[in-house]
Amino acid sequence: MKKVIAITGPTASGKTSLSIKIAKKFNLEIINCDSLQMYQKYDIGTAKITLEEAQGIKHHLLDFLAPGTNYSIYHFQKDARKKIEETPLPLFVGGSGLYLKSALFDYELTPKSLFLPPTSLPAIENMIDFIKQKDPQLIANLDLKNPRRILSAYQDLLEGTLRSQKNKKHNSLYSSLIFYLDIDRQILKKRVILRLEQMLKQGFIEEVNQIQTHFPNPNFNIIGYREIKALLEGKITLDQAKTLIIQKTMQYAKRQKTWFKNQIKPIILDALSPDLEKTTICLINDFLKTD
């Protein structure tokens, strides 16, 4: 069974830094598993790795889609599995849990959502609860005032769930070693605040302005981008935008941790441990020795 490694965790937990160290140590190529970092121009607000930070490590499925491109979990599953087969020892990096699970586990997805007649649809509130359970990142970035988007997200997830249950899926297709970088919430919040201030200094507001100016129908139902867009439209102040971004990010991080623990059951590592790199390397060495 092909071996695959993954490093996941909340924003600002140190995934990028650790992944580069591990990739250099074991001569790995990285497959991006952050659904937002796949899009071009969404750089500052997604904390996308820079060329300098990458240190020559090859990255796949990163910064390759034009804003507004329709690229679903179905497309990612196909592309990610192709990259897995092409890469001697792939390293997934990112916090989009459902994307990672769709690539590594035996999910059967199709390009079209299931058609459900209106009489069979649950209430909007129940759809939202279902989405929240299945994909915390999706609910964090979903416009809950838009019933059409809620229905679309619900149908996409329902299709994958029904097909998985019907075919008794959820079995791993690969021999996987998955790490989750855990971090104290108070320290994480301080990091999120610091990162947001850095993003604003780097030009986050201008980035949002440029995207909406030059691309039709860009996706701004994303934590950070949604609030900055509201700021540019004069609906909220900068302080209000910052407060909302921090609040939404922390809420998402909480749901994200619960989802990973329940759905993927990764090896949880202390992101602040001085022995983090050493521990990770030891675990990978042991993993590579097994058949």
Swiss-Prot record:
<keyword id="KW-0819">tRNA processing</keyword>
<keyword id="KW-0547">Nucleotide-binding</keyword>
<feature type="site" description="Interaction with substrate tRNA">
    <location>
        <position position="96"/>
    </location>
</feature>
<dbReference type="InterPro" id="IPR018022">
    <property type="entry name" value="IPT"/>
</dbReference>
<feature type="region of interest" description="Interaction with substrate tRNA">
    <location>
        <begin position="34"/>
        <end position="37"/>
    </location>
</feature>
<comment type="similarity">
    <text>Belongs to the IPP transferase family.</text>
</comment>
<comment type="subunit">
    <text>Monomer.</text>
</comment>
<dbReference type="InterPro" id="IPR027417">
    <property type="entry name" value="P-loop_NTPase"/>
</dbReference>
<comment type="function">
    <text>Catalyzes the transfer of a dimethylallyl group onto the adenine at position 37 in tRNAs that read codons beginning with uridine, leading to the formation of N6-(dimethylallyl)adenosine (i(6)A).</text>
</comment>
<dbReference type="GO" id="GO:0005524">
    <property type="term" value="F:ATP binding"/>
</dbReference>
<keyword id="KW-0808">Transferase</keyword>
<dbReference type="GO" id="GO:0006400">
    <property type="term" value="P:tRNA modification"/>
</dbReference>
<keyword id="KW-0067">ATP-binding</keyword>
<feature type="binding site">
    <location>
        <begin position="11"/>
        <end position="16"/>
    </location>
    <ligand>
        <name>substrate</name>
    </ligand>
</feature>
<dbReference type="InterPro" id="IPR039657">
    <property type="entry name" value="Dimethylallyltransferase"/>
</dbReference>
<dbReference type="GO" id="GO:0052381">
    <property type="term" value="F:tRNA dimethylallyltransferase activity"/>
</dbReference>
<protein>
    <recommendedName>
        <fullName>tRNA dimethylallyltransferase</fullName>
        <ecNumber>2.5.1.75</ecNumber>
    </recommendedName>
</protein>
<dbReference type="Pfam" id="PF01715">
    <property type="entry name" value="IPPT"/>
</dbReference>
<keyword id="KW-0460">Magnesium</keyword>
<feature type="binding site">
    <location>
        <begin position="9"/>
        <end position="16"/>
    </location>
    <ligand>
        <name>ATP</name>
    </ligand>
</feature>
